[in-house]
């Protein structure tokens, strides 16, 4: 048994310009090879493009997109008696936001287009409207959980 105490849960810091935790979570997920300044550049350009496209507050569009993509329930592989079942589990808010951000970035990376800022802004605007690959991924996850509802007692 470990003698160390339980680690304190770190609170998510907010970014320097918008003072927003979601923006910081997005920056930390888009980060590659430790190039944080480049990640900030991409996010801020995407936010400016959202401002130009929608002519509304870009942070509210970001919040709306993440809220739209955040799943309520997901499936987890659980091995029972030699066979693996997809067991539906409820997801907490932090984990749901993390999944939503991961799906948004994955969908924007797959998009054809000029640069990452443009692709990310397009995906965020689409997600806020209720369309796009990330929304489809959420719906697919919900369908999967609904289909495997019979295994919910394996939790």
From Swiss-Prot:
PROSITE patterns: RIBOSOMAL_S7. InterPro entries: Ribosomal_uS7, Ribosomal_uS7_bac/org-type, Ribosomal_uS7_CS, Ribosomal_uS7_dom, Ribosomal_uS7_dom_sf. It is found in: Plastid, Chloroplast. GO terms for cellular component: chloroplast; small ribosomal subunit. Coiled coil: none annotated. GO terms for molecular function: rRNA binding; structural constituent of ribosome. GO terms for biological process: translation. Signal peptide: none annotated. Keywords: Chloroplast, Plastid, Ribonucleoprotein, Ribosomal protein, RNA-binding, rRNA-binding. PANTHER family: RIBOSOMAL PROTEIN S7. One of the primary rRNA binding proteins, it binds directly to 16S rRNA where it nucleates assembly of the head domain of the 30S subunit. Part of the 30S ribosomal subunit. Belongs to the universal ribosomal protein uS7 family. This is Small ribosomal subunit protein uS7cz/uS7cy. It comes from Buxus microphylla. The gene is rps7-A.
């Amino acid at each position: 048994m470990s003698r160390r105490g339980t680690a304190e849960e770190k609170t998510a810091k907010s970014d320097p310009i918008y003072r927003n935790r979601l923006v910081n979570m997005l920056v930390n997920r888009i980060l590659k090879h430790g190039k944080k300044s480049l990640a900030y550049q991409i996010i801020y350009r995407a936010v400016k493009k959202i401002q130009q496209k929608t002519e509304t507050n870009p942070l509210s569009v970001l919040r709306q997109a993440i809220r739209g993509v955040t799943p309520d329930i997901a499936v987890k592989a659980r091995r029972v008696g030699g066979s693996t079942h997809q067991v539906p589990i409820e997801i907490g808010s932090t984990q749901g936001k993390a999944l939503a951000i991961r799906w948004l970035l994955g969908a924007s990376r797959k998009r054809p287009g000029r640069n990452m800022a443009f692709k990310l802004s397009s995906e965020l605007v689409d997600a806020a409207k209720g369309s796009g690959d990330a929304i489809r991924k959420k719906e697919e996850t919900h369908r999967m959980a609904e289909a495997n509802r019979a295994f919910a007692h394996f939790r």
